[in-house]
Amino acid sequence: MCFSPVLEINMQSESNVTVRDDIEDIDTNMYQPLSYPLSFQVSLTGFLMLEIVLGLGSNLTVLVLYCMKSNLISSVSNIITMNLHVLDVIICVGCIPLTIVILLLSLERNTALICCFHEACVSFASVSTAINVFAITLDRYDISVKPANRILTMGRAVMLMTSIWIFSFFSFLIPFIEVNFFSLQSGNAWENKTLLCVSTSEYYTELGMYYHLLVQIPIFFFTVIVMLITYTKILQALNIRIGTRFSTGQKKKARKKKTISLTTHETTDMSQSSGGRNVVFGVRTSVSVIIALRRAVKRHRERRERQKRVFKMSLLIISTFLLCWTPISVLNTTILCLGPSDLLVKLRLCFLVMAYGTTIFHPLLYAFTRQKFQKVLKSKMKKRVVSIVEADPMPNNAVIHNSWIDPKRNKKVTYEDSEIREKCLVPQVVTD
């Protein structure tokens, strides 16, 4: 009888403790902390959505125009470039949305599987982008330095692209191999190993968890070195050719000037001795020589413009790749040396947004700057405008004369021999 009140008190205290624990658990579940600050989430999500819209729209436009025009697909260079645009579409559809999901997740949830998929997508995007840019660099070198004896034939290009996709798929599987995802053991054995995601628990700091970083870093630096060497050789080859052509062109111009002076001197002598026929002959030869000189000057200017254009495009391609992928590669090296932390993981997400910017720059650098692609795009736009004008006719049978659509604008004006002779002789008759 003495122990009954004591037992009742103990039971009441235990019940109170359990009730308080349940209340605390409910409170913590109701107010879960976010993994990142709200401003950080909003800004990065906005940039990622912009990259999805612009990158997906521009890359799909390029692919549709390439597929609509059969002569664009026939070349090796365009096929290799199309491979890069297909990769950018995959990144816009699969990798960038998963990064947005990682940004918006909370800390307390079990996000091991999503983090693993995100790391796999980042590894895939990094490795495949570097390899595709490397392939395009080799193709540019092959065209510029060895145009007659090309190494990249159609069969070799297909083999190269197949090997690129196989290696990219293997880089996608590396994060799953690191966490023993495909092992026959229990499925919960790998869930506690978070992969570079901000978490309340400590990071898994063993080197075996970051083999995918060890793959990304050497491939990036190797691609950068190859790009620098290759584009310098391309510029050297163009300078040598243009320089030799300019020197020979200058010699030819000097010879032509001598011949012009001789012909003019001869024509003056002949004009003094003979009559009007020799005057007409001298004028005709001088006009032909002037036309030849104008053509030579035009070719000289075109070569100079081509040299400047190639130099600018080479600088833009190299600087864009370095600007987008160098920060995240350097940060991956820092993570391998110092280990992961919350600050480094947040910086990595910021640099990943910069790296995804190549999905916007690749169509601008590799497709819209090509003259053949520009011609196809202009022709499609003209046909579209013509179809719109024909679909909506003006009332009262009014005719619209559009100088952009009118084919007479591009019509070349030709003169007969008699007209040229009359135009050349008119000033002489007036002066006489």
Swiss-Prot record:
**Cytoplasmic topological intervals:** 1-45, 107-115, 178-208, 336-348
What GO molecular functions are on record for this protein? G protein-coupled receptor activity
Q: Which residues lie on this side of the membrane: Extracellular?
A: 67-85, 137-156, 230-314, 370-432
An example GO CC term for this entry is:
plasma membrane
Localization terms from the record: Cell membrane
Q: Which PROSITE patterns match?
A: G_PROTEIN_RECEP_F1_2
Task: Classify the protein's membrane topology as the record does.
Answer: Multi-pass membrane protein
Kindly list the cysteine pairs connected by disulfide bridges.
Answer: none
Q: Which tissues and organs express this gene's product? A: Abundant levels detected in the brain. High expression in the heart (at protein level). No detectable expression in other peripheral tissues.
GO BP field? cell projection organization; cellular response to hormone stimulus; G protein-coupled receptor signaling pathway
Where mainly located? membrane
* Keywords on record: Cell membrane, Cilium biogenesis/degradation, Membrane, Receptor, Transmembrane, Transmembrane helix
Cross-referenced SUPFAM superfamilies:
Family A G protein-coupled receptor-like
The record's InterPro entries line, in alphabetical order, gives:
GPCR_Rhodpsn, GPCR_Rhodpsn_7TM
Checking Pfam families in the record gives: 7tm_1
Membrane-spanning ranges: 46-66, 86-106, 116-136, 157-177, 209-229, 315-335, 349-369
Q: Which family does it belong to?
A: Belongs to the G-protein coupled receptor 1 family.
Record function comment: Orphan G-protein coupled receptor. Seems to act through a G(i)/G(o) mediated pathway. May be involved in ciliogenesis.
Q: What is this protein called?
A: G-protein coupled receptor 22
Q: Which gene encodes it?
A: Gpr22
